[in-house]
Amino acid sequence: MSSIVNKSGTRFAPKVRQRRAATGGTPTPKPRTPQLFIPESKEIEEDNSDNDKGVDENETAIVEKPSLVGERSLEGFTLTGTNGHDNEIGDEGPIDASTQNPKADVIEDNVTLKPAPLQTHRDQKVPRSSRLASLSKDNESRPSFKPSFLDSSSNSNGTARRLSTISNKLPKKIRLGSITENDMNLKTFKRHRVLGKPSSAKKPAGAHRISIVSKISPPTAMTDSLDRNEFSSETSTSREADENENYVISKVKDIPKKVRDGESAKYFIDEENFTMAELCKPNFPIGQISENFEKSKMAKKAKLEKRRHLRELRMRARQEFKPLHSLTKEEQEEEEEKRKEERDKLLNADIPESDRKAHTAIQLKLNPDGTMAIDEETMVVDRHKNASIENEYKEKVDENPFANLYNYGSYGRGSYTDPWTVEEMIKFYKALSMWGTDFNLISQLYPYRSRKQVKAKFVNEEKKRPILIELALRSKLPPNFDEYCCEIKKNIGTVADFNEKLIELQNEHKHHMKEIEEAKNTAKEEDQTAQRLNDANLNKKGSGGIMTNDLKVYRKTEVVLGTIDDLKRKKLKERNNDDNEDNEGSEEEPEIDQ
């Protein structure tokens, strides 16, 4: 055989391919062998009886409807059928011919279909247009042939008309129901069958579909109870394993979105892969629960409750057409009244004399034997008892450090503004065209909103819809005062009523000023009379015949040498000194006589 030299200078021998018989369809590559476990006879079941203990008695059967041709080659595989009547399949019913279970598992490589010998163009038959045999949905039994099918196949010509040969050395039996449509071998087998079929091929009259029928056995109470017990035990063990299992988180994305409070301790951080930036995330719901977790949770709950209460107050103010601060003021007044009632009740209560006032100094007590001793009870002061008595009417609050968290918006005066409805916007533009930019009048239409909020809404609308604002301001509407009073739900009155009230106020003011002048004059007269009486009483004669005014003048110039007490003390000291000298002289005289 001559060799060929390619462009690179490499000499190689061409491959020799054997000739194939001409076929009517397009040539297709040989697909991978689908692996099915099909028991051939009872002898194989007896040889493998040790492996059949856990398998159910009901087995699936591959049944082929009678066809005109006893043997048909399919991409290198031989499938045999019988020429029986349709009554053989009719006994099973329509339920038995089920489709393939999509959730079954892929079987192991136990059995392969027998490759068919190559056929000539004369012997080649038109391939069947039916799809591959569907598999049963029942996973409780393994495939098996029906007796009629096995008998007919055994009577056919030789071993070439058998479906497949099965090895006696089977390591393990696997159910056919575990084959899924996702099996790669099955998919390639189907694809090559479709590609190998010619477009002009027609389904012959005797061609029938090969279907796998599962035998349905009636359930028993024992099997159902056993299955339930096994399932419950498996679920309980799986739950216990899940409860005791710990998880290692290597990325922030691996953290579950919803983690229960009790399960957060099961998640651990991979210290080698985690960075400080990831650890500084604001929400990191894994790890051991600290002591402050419950406090923060309670603070968050209280914050949401307060927010809900304010929302209800705003809704109530909108419905009752009242300002929001009036509702809050009513609540504050009610709380203050309750505190006053509790305080008055405590003050009017009868408190024992011992509890009324605590002793500030150590006291003495008389013992039964007549001796005096220190009262030990007065040496101890119970401040908590005194505080509880004095502050019993006050409200006791346990402070939570997480309740009042401060940020850049904590010290601002901004309040939440409810969104404006369509009716409010219509009223707003109508008021603009009627009253202009007098926001004091416009804010009366919205008592549950402040003037600041109305002005902010005007500025916002002027930015978003300047044309509408310009049209509303230029198209002046005639002011309707009665309609305005009806909308604000107030009776302002007419100009005549206003003038009458003004005259009444002026008269009251004049009368009040007259009363003030009269009070000033009477007070001035009283001061003058009191001054005259004081002057008359001051300038009187004293005990020495000197007037009080002259005595004051003399006392300003006199010098004080001492007081009477000082003179008495001085005289007493002199007497004592004289007595001491007399005593000393009397003691010296007897000594001289001796």
Swiss-Prot record:
InterPro entries: Bdp1_fungi, Homeodomain-like_sf, SANT/Myb, TFIIIB_B''_Myb. Keywords: Activator, Nucleus, Phosphoprotein, Transcription, Transcription regulation. Residues 225-241, 317-330, 520-529 have a biased composition (Basic and acidic residues). Residues 1-169, 217-245, 317-343, 520-547, 567-594 are annotated as: Disordered. Its main location: nucleus. It holds the Pfam family Myb_DNA-bind_7. The keyword Nucleus applies. One of its GO terms (molecular function) is TFIIIC-class transcription factor complex binding. It is found in: Nucleus. The modification Phosphoserine is found at residues 49, 178. Belongs to the TFC5 family. TFIIIB comprises the TATA-binding protein (TBP), the B-related factor (BRF) and the B'' component (BDP1). Interacts with TFC4. This is Transcription factor TFIIIB component B''. It comes from Saccharomyces cerevisiae (strain ATCC 204508 / S288c) (Baker's yeast).
